[in-house]
Amino acid sequence: MGIEEETIGIAPVGCAVFAYNYLDIDWIEAAHGRAPAIASAVKRLNPKKMVFTYQGDGDLAAIGTAETIHACNRGENIAIIFINNGIYGMTGGQMAPTTLEGMVTSTCPYGRNVALNGYPLRIAELVERVDGTCYVTRQS
């Protein structure tokens, strides 16, 4: 596509850092959960660049929920790619905010029980209701 020179990726700590090995673009490593805030600043400073985040569920749906919702609410001109595997994948497969009901993890060996653990956080459905959000899609 020839857009490598015009693209900046923001990836936080965790599984997302592996993306550096596969895409030959400029990358910024963000503090855990802060990728949308960093991406917002980078885009405002470089309005002609394509800026995106690449985040796992521990980063986006746990520690970074506020940054994600507020970036969407402000209508920031960034793309957020959310890799949701339903667990904290890099630290041993623990239950994450997105772990599905009944899903077995290393910290809930009998499956997620909503009476004990609450409901899974449905990020796509949450941000699609935010007025500043432009486009939401779920892929598998």
Model-found features: residue ranges?
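Structural motif
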Residues: 7-9, 49-52, 77-81, 125, ...
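Thiamine diphosphate
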Residues: 13-89
